[in-house]
């Protein structure tokens, strides 16, 4: 594993929220919390933007205990693709959803910290590992590329694109 792609929770800018606890996120996605003022934000109805089952949702279910068996509110809007979720974040004033941090960086949507931890931190609990699978014998070009991935210039590129380099 050379990097992680964090799965970030994103909100529309009008919510007034910049940090949520794991429990608050579960309460929001289950429908127990329905207004942003209940979690320190503005008096605005929450619009849950969910995703169909897939790697992002599996990562959340695996790493947030309260999300493991959670039934998403029936009022949720489902977005098939990241682009749909980005559009929802910009269209619906009270929206919340989740997506890879690389998409957050690419589209400039608002990510919240999770229990005070930003998605860019190595301690952030939600992420998908990235690695390489290769044959035992490497060509000189492949060896050079794998060596480059471990350098600081490559790590800078990873950070700028919403990936978190993993230190061995």
Predicted features by range, described:
Residues 1-168:
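Exported/periplasmic ABC-transporter solute-binding proteins
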């Amino acid at each position: 594993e050379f990097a992680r792609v964090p799965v970030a929770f994103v909100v529309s800018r009008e919510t007034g929220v910049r940090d949520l606890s794991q429990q608050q996120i579960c309460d929001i996605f289950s429908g127990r919390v329905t207004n942003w003022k209940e979690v320190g934000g503005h008096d605005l109805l929450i619009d849950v933007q969910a995703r169909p089952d897939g790697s992002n949702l599996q990562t959340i279910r695996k790493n947030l205990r309260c999300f493991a068996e959670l039934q998403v509110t029936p009022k949720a809007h489902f977005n098939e693709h990241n682009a749909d979720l980005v559009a929802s974040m910009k269209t619906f004033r009270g929206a919340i959803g989740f997506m890879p941090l690389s998409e957050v960086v690419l589209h400039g949507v608002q990510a919240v910290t999770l229990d005070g931890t930003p998605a860019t931190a190595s301690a952030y609990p939600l992420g998908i590992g990235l690695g390489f699978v290769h044959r035992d014998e490497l060509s000189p070009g492949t060896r050079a590329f794998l060596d480059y991935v471990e350098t600081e210039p490559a790590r800078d590129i990873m950070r700028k694109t919403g990936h978190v380099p993993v230190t061995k």
